[in-house]
């Protein structure tokens, strides 16, 4: 069986080189074109889906919609869930990456960005931009909403959704598309492929490129490739 991952198209804050995380920003024109191209590639390669999973952030939802529209599959069920959100970058969200490196030093920012188990500083829950003040998360217990995450915590957040939703869909024979974010997809890939803590730091997923994971009938990893 095959599972298709797509990282959302290039966003407004990708273009501005800002830390994004759970902040909700839109796609750029480049990002829209990337999503269209992804949908066209999937259509040309004959990929059909029974269900699509995405996050509750606009850039991933729009990418999912565009991909499905371009491949004439906009009608299939879509499941939006916060567990597929990008890694939460804490107090770094909204900051310029270059300016942050100048303030704290390249080494410290590199640790915050690339360490598997070290998180950036927390975002104050009372901050107007905190997810605690966003009604899309109002149904969640306050202690579940993160104030900052590393990749290890992101994996712990994403894994229950894999086990409860994505894996059962695959095992039931459904053809699955997951349109999400660089780090939530990296976390899933780490689990599925069996990438080590050290190796995952160099594992990147480009924006808007369909990544196909081939799995056996027990969801063991076989191979991966980009369309």
From Swiss-Prot:
Protein name: 2,3-bisphosphoglycerate-dependent phosphoglycerate mutase
SMART domains: PGAM
Class of this enzyme: isomerase
Recorded catalytic activity of this chain's protein: (2R)-2-phosphoglycerate = (2R)-3-phosphoglycerate
Native species: Actinobacillus pleuropneumoniae serotype 5b (strain L20)
This protein's pathway: Carbohydrate degradation; glycolysis; pyruvate from D-glyceraldehyde 3-phosphate: step 3/5
EC number: 5.4.2.11
Site feature (Transition state stabilizer) residues: 181
Alphabetized UniProt keyword annotations: Gluconeogenesis, Glycolysis, Isomerase
Gene expressing this chain: gpmA
Keyword Isomerase attributed: yes
Transmembrane stretches, start-end: none
CDD domains membership: HP_PGM_like (cd07067)
Family according to the record: Belongs to the phosphoglycerate mutase family. BPG-dependent PGAM subfamily.
Function: Catalyzes the interconversion of 2-phosphoglycerate and 3-phosphoglycerate.
A single GO BP: gluconeogenesis
GO MF, any single term: phosphoglycerate mutase activity
């Amino acid at each position: 069986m095959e599972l298709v991952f797509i990282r959302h198209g290039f966003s407004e804050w990708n273009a501005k080189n800002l830390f994004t995380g759970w902040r909700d920003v839109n796609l750029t024109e480049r990002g829209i074109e990337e999503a269209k191209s992804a949908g066209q590639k999937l259509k040309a390669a004959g990929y059909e889906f029974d269900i699509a999973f995405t996050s509750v952030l606009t850039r991933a939802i729009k990418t999912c919609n565009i991909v499905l529209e371009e491949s004439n599959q906009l009608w299939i069920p879509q499941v939006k869930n916060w567990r597929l959100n990008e890694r939460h970058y804490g107090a770094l969200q909204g900051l310029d990456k270059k300016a942050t490196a100048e303030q704290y030093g390249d080494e410290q920012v590199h640790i915050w960005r690339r360490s598997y188990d070290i998180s950036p500083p927390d975002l104050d829950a009372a901050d107007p931009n905190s997810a605690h003040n966003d009604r899309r998360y109002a149904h969640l217990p306050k202690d579940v909403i993160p104030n900052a995450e590393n990749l290890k915590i992101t994996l712990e957040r994403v894994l229950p959704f894999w086990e409860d939703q994505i894996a059962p869909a695959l095992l039931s024979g459904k053809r699955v598309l997951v349109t999400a974010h660089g780090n939530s997809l990296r976390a899933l890939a780490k689990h599925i492929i069996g990438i080590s803590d050290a190796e995952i730091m160099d594992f990147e997923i480009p924006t808007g490129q369909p990544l196909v994971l081939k799995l056996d009938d027990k969801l063991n990893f076989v191979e991966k490739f980009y369309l």
